[in-house]
């Protein structure tokens, strides 16, 4: 209102009257809400849990090691913000097949699953832009829980909609990397210190992603 008046325009044409502004400021009239959308939409902390399990052992003839790790991290968005999951698997086997022949096998893989909200505009920053564009003069909820308030003038409906993957759309991305290697080593007994080694390796990375937007 003040910017409107200072720009030389009449006070009568301002979007809000002084009385309306005071009602929004007081926060005592349900018809004049003042919603803190950042506080309503965003968590103060991001829940996550991680679990690791390892196993190792063996004999003089064979040694082994195995590792499994799991991470689950929720989004900063309180409602329908999605989550990130990661699986780590690693194993190693060293074996002495014969007196002068040994083998080594290594394997590792990382699997990542990302499940987040999405809408077809402005890419990764759309949710953050929507938070700042969602106006505080709209309520975060309505008396009828089956209805959703429209809280934005930029055509998105508000960040409480676009930040919720159950209401706006989904962006699901799955990544997997695989590394595997194996080797054989043969010690030539006739020539001390001489050995021959064969080595094979695999390095693979893949990504699968799906986008879906509700009409």
List where the protein language model places each region:
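Outer-membrane beta-barrel domain signature
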Residues: 68-70, 75-76, 81-82, 89-90, ...
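A surface-exposed, glycine/aromatic-enriched loop/edge motif typical of exported proteins
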Residues: 1-19, 110-154, 206-215
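Tryptophan-centered motif/residue detector
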Residues: 36-38, 87, 212
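Short N-terminal secondary-structure initiator segments
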Residues: 1-21, 88-111, 151-181
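Residues embedded in well-ordered regular secondary structure
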Residues: 1-80
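Extracellular loop and loop/strand-boundary signature of outer-membrane beta-barrel proteins
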Residues: 38-40, 74-79, 90-92, 165-170, ...
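Outer-membrane beta-barrel transmembrane strands
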Residues: 43-62, 69, 157-212
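Membrane-spanning beta-strand positions in outer-membrane beta-barrel proteins
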Residues: 52, 63-67, 96, 100-106, ...
């Amino acid at each position: 209102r003040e910017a409107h008046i200072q720009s030389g325009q009449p006070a009568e044409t301002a979007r809000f009257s002084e009385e309306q502004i005071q009602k929004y400021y007081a926060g005592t009239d349900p018809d004049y809400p003042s919603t803190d959308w950042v506080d309503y939409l965003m968590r103060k902390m991001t829940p996550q849990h991680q679990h690791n399990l390892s196993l190792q052992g063996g004999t003089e003839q064979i040694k082994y090691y195995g590792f499994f790790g799991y991470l689950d991290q929720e989004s900063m968005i309180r409602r329908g913000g999605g989550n990130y999951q990661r699986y780590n698997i690693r194993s190693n086997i060293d074996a002495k097949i014969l007196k002068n022949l040994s083998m080594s096998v290594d394997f590792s893989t990382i699997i990542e699953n990302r499940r987040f909200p999405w809408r077809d505009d402005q890419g990764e920053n759309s949710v953050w832009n929507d938070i700042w564009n969602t106006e505080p003069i709209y309520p975060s909820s309505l008396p009828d829980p089956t209805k959703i308030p429209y809280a934005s003038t930029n055509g998105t409906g508000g960040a409480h909609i676009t930040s919720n993957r159950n209401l706006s759309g989904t962006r699901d991305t799955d990544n997997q990397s695989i590394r595997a290697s194996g080797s054989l080593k043969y010690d030539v007994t006739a020539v001390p210190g001489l050995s021959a080694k064969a080595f094979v390796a695999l390095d693979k990375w893949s990504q699968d992603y799906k986008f879906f937007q509700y009409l």
